[in-house]
Amino acid sequence: MNNVILYCRPGFEKECSAEVTEKAAAREIFGFARVKDNSGYVVFVCYQHEEADRLVRVLPLRSLIFARQMILVGELLRDLPAEDRITQIAGMLTGAVAGAGEVRVEVPDTNESKELMKFCRKLTVPLRAALRAQRILKGEEHRSPQVIHVLFIAPGCCYAGYSYRDNHSPFYMGIPRLRFPPDAPSRSMLKLEEAFHVFIPADEWDERLGSGMYAVDLGACPGGWTYQLVKRSMMVHAVDNGTMDEALMATGQVIHHRADGFRFEPPRNNVYWLVCDMVEKPSRVAQLAADWLVKGWCREAIFNLKLPMKKRYEEVSQNLRLLIDHLQVNGVHGEVHAKQLYHDREEVTVHARRFWSAVPGRRDER
């Protein structure tokens, strides 16, 4: 197996390809990408067979902006007979996987592929039984290092391979399944909820997303992101010249500031979260978030960067470098991650966390 498949948002295959090629080369792993527009996935072919397995181990999925999932697969299985699709799939996995803990039969995130979802669900049960009989899969759901993936790209055509549990998305197809509450003022609240799932480990939610925290939402109206914070029992300063959702204001957890988000300064010293989903130039939003973190006005920030029509990977990379450089120059130790979420469109979501500052006299939590 020398192919690495990366799931991505349809229309962003070129960005995903450029990113994996660049970051693989930085680890001295070389190959080429096969890209089909609007397919929802990229195939990165490593020149050396053993390098593909190394790539899915050493390249953190978390470091990839445009990839939702990363799996190692063999060659495309074509024209699988309708009466027996399982034999060839099991044959591809034999010798490559032993004692995996889970099997996922998936499709790319396209309208055409979603027509195969019903078939994938039907195939999963007999495939699981066959793989268990051959000891490719353990006898019960198990947290084994490997997870088997079968990716159908068309009827009778699939890739079969695996991911490593410590470097993959835990979500089916790399997509968290979230419910839109009927009382939410905007579907944008799903972006922030997904960001929490992607960026914040579940065992740290009580500490970092806890009740009673203070947050600032810049560009808040009508209140989609504020809603998500309020549901987590936070106190929110919502900053926007527009009108906030009345039900949100009635909770007593929101203070509405009619102000420019780029000029607003927090009225408290204990704001933990900054969130921002303003339609602005990405460089301006990145600089704004960097300023908040450097000044110690917040401890963590989640914000969206709207993407241009062309050179989208270059634009994101440039703005992330701006943010990281600004923190480093000002002696702020932290971490920065970015991901194009399922609920994002022509944008990416960035998470930045401040640990401590080397400069005394700032609002700081050591």
From Swiss-Prot:
The residues listed in the UniProt record as binding S-adenosyl-L-methionine, with positions renumbered to this chain, are 188, 221-224, 240, 260, 277
Q: Which InterPro entries match?
A: RlmM_FDX, RlmM_THUMP-like, RNA_MeTrfase_FtsJ_dom, rRNA_MeTrfase_M, SAM-dependent_MTases_sf
Does tRNA-binding show up as a keyword for this record? no
Record's GO cellular component terms: cytoplasm
Q: Which Pfam family is an annotated match for this chain, by its short name?
A: FtsJ
Q: Which UniProt keywords apply?
A: Cytoplasm, Methyltransferase, rRNA processing, S-adenosyl-L-methionine, Transferase
Q: Does the keyword rRNA processing apply?
A: yes
Catalytic activities: cytidine(2498) in 23S rRNA + S-adenosyl-L-methionine = 2'-O-methylcytidine(2498) in 23S rRNA + S-adenosyl-L-homocysteine + H(+)
In terms of superkingdom, the source organism counts as Bacteria
Q: What class of enzyme is it?
A: transferase
Gene Ontology BP annotations: methylation; rRNA processing
What assembly does the database describe for this protein? Answer: Monomer.
Function text: Catalyzes the 2'-O-methylation at nucleotide C2498 in 23S rRNA.
The name on file for this protein is: Ribosomal RNA large subunit methyltransferase M
Which species does this protein come from?
Sodalis glossinidius (strain morsitans)
